[in-house]
Amino acid sequence: AYQYSRKAPEGIKPAENVNIVLCTIELNRSRPIRTDPSSQGFVNDISNWKKLTNNILIWDYIVQFRNYLDPFPNLHVLQPNIQFFSDSGVHMMFEQGSNRSLSEFHELRSYIMAKLLWNPDANADAIMNDFLNGFYGEAGPHLRKYIDQMRKALVESDGPLTFYGYPWDGYHTSLT
């Protein structure tokens, strides 16, 4: 359900063999969904759907789709978002990234998502370091520093991060 069709209906329940698919298409990717003021409508919609059914699937977007090579420093929200969905009783997830090595840190994102979907409470920092050091070798710590600097700049800017943004959107946020 995108935007206008995302709200739970009143006076009707889905049949047991129906899955409700809720998409995070319009959400900000710079802050965790649970604590982002602009995402509270989505939080409420999940809660309202949970009153009607346990068959909820989240379709989440985790890369910059307009420009795959654009830095998209959202790695820090992946775990809290998965934890939010799990805590909300949602156990079906589709995390859409790029389908091959076209996007920024595709392999890293895939590795993190695989680990966190299996165990939402796993140590995300250890998972990231394990991948960076294993995949990039001696460059791993330098890439971790880059990732942390991008995250820090984005968080300190308090700016949004949308998956249909433009490369220049980061000029005042993560690329400062």
Regions found by a protein language model. Name each.
Residues 4-5, 10, 89, 115-176:
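Catalytic domains of carbohydrate-active enzymes that cleave complex glycans
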